Amino acid sequence: MAVLQRRSSRRDLAAVAVFSGVGLVLGGCGLLPGRRREIEVAASSGLTDAVIAVGEDHEPRDVASATEEEFDWDRFAVYTIGTPATTINEESGVIVETGERYSTQEVLFVFHRDGTAVRGAPSGFEFLAHGAGAWWGPRTQLVWDPEQGTRLEDPDA
């Protein structure tokens, strides 16, 4: 279980986003050891323009910055967009195809392929954190459950 921490300095956050994005690209291309091309979970808030990547061991890996309000989804598997707490491929969802590009404003709610929704709330840039992202507060946790899939949990909510 990983705790997602909040950073306060915008300069630190910008550096983290750039370096993490580079690591995500290199890892997705197979240039870094221990990285898989297929990433299980992604979430973008639209305003934060960030993606949370979760590896095979269900631990957060990287935050990658969006460029020009678009995300290159080639690095990700197929996801469903919809409303929070609904399951994948319901009528409210929209399929995100690999290889397509979407405005971050369109990608508000992204689901784990086999589990509970992971929601990116419209928050500011200060919610980016090293290796992960925090949506509801500094104590937000990324939780893996074999029955429910990956989800975000805030003990303060």
Language model regions located:
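N-terminal secretory signal peptides and thylakoid transit peptides that target proteins
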Residues: 3-20
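Bacterial signal peptide processing site
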Residues: 30-32
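Post-signal peptide N-terminal segment of mature Sec-exported envelope proteins
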Residues: 38-57
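Mature extracytoplasmic domains of secretory-pathway proteins
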Residues: 56-122, 126
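C-terminal partner/receptor-binding element of secreted or periplasmic proteins
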Residues: 126-157
